From Swiss-Prot:
NADP(+) binds at residues 8-9, 16-21, 45-48, 65-68, 98-103. This is Dihydrofolate reductase. Belongs to the dihydrofolate reductase family. Coiled coil: none annotated. The gene is folA. Key enzyme in folate metabolism. Catalyzes an essential reaction for de novo glycine and purine synthesis, and for DNA precursor synthesis. GO terms for molecular function: dihydrofolate reductase activity; NADP binding. Keywords: Antibiotic resistance, NADP, One-carbon metabolism, Oxidoreductase, Trimethoprim resistance. Strain T47/F62 is trimethoprim resistant by overproduction of DHFR.
Amino acid sequence: MLKITIIAACAENLCIGAGNAMPWHIPEDFAFFKVYTLGKPVIMGRKTWESLPVKPLPGRRNIVISRQADYCAAGAETVASLEVALALCAGAEEAVIMGGAQIYGQAMPLATDLRITEVDLSVEGDAFFPEIDRTHWREAERTERRVSSKGVAYTFVHYLGK
């Protein structure tokens, strides 16, 4: 069975983005993301794809979901739905959902794992992570609170579906 992991960094108010960008810069979180996703298929929405500084993400199968039938994401596979994206990952052990807000909302009922970076900020934004329903998720691991090289405090949390 395909393991479906959602990976996200969320502020205290569950904000994940503002103006199609992350409202913070945590190099250590980017490093964790890279190590965790290398060699795995990553699934993202069109806006997340367009926000990437480097496209496609190297060392990963990039799958972009877009409702625009003629959308072309050079270096990635473009599909019309999350279901089609997951079907493309059938031969993999794990697929990683990396955003944005709409894709996270669609993926939550299907996910087996959540890899959440809790960012100790409350920021203004226009994209938010769905509420984590504790009746469906249990905390499996939590790192000690750390402060990034940019001065932002964060914690890595791993949730497993119940």
